[in-house]
Amino acid sequence: GDVGVIVSDHGQFEVKETIHLQGGKVGHVGVMTKGMFQTGETVTLKVCEKNRLSTAKNHSATHLLQKALRMVLGDHVEQAGSYVDAGRLRFDFTHFSAMTPEELQKVEDLVNEEIQAALPVVTEEMSLDEAKKSGAMALFGEKYGEKVRVVKMGDFSVELCGGTHVSNTEKISAFKILSEAGIAAGVRRIEALTGEGLMAYYQDTEKELHSAAKTAKTTPAELQKKIEAMLEEIK
């Protein structure tokens, strides 16, 4: 959810998390950083736009990921859970075995192709029956009202969703799968990065590679050969 600050003439509250409450209300979780609010006073909510955009990138990427998984693995794939924040995304899905490196690469390539295709992301409210007729993917076991929100990404992905998304897939920048593992019988989990989080990951990896090469007294390009030679000497 969103983070940011809530301010008034008498205090400031730092919002670290937002949660859904019963009755359609939203709870703001955080700490008072200045003063104290007074009952009945007017407050101003200031959303951290950078956090919202990064979270939206990861959320939109999960939609592309689900469609790519169904294309590569089959229509038996269904969402079994997900988590997104500004730093990363996690997607749980139904599948009967570990994915091969080739399958993971195909999925990653498909997602990146749709990012580069700059697909418009369009949201529309319609009846549940209309959404089903449009082919929109829905969460298994989820209860929906008569009116639902449909998120469409070009002709590639159509899902029922009430979350925040980018306006165009090109804003996701890039997508990288970090891991794929089983979390329960018949349920797999993929963790991945997009946007600024992915850039930071590549920068950290590059630093580690250069550091390892320096320790081995070689260049990053020759590091594997150097390690193989060292292992051969040990035998």
Predicted segment positions?
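A glycine- and charged-residue-rich anion-binding loop/surface
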Residues: 1-235
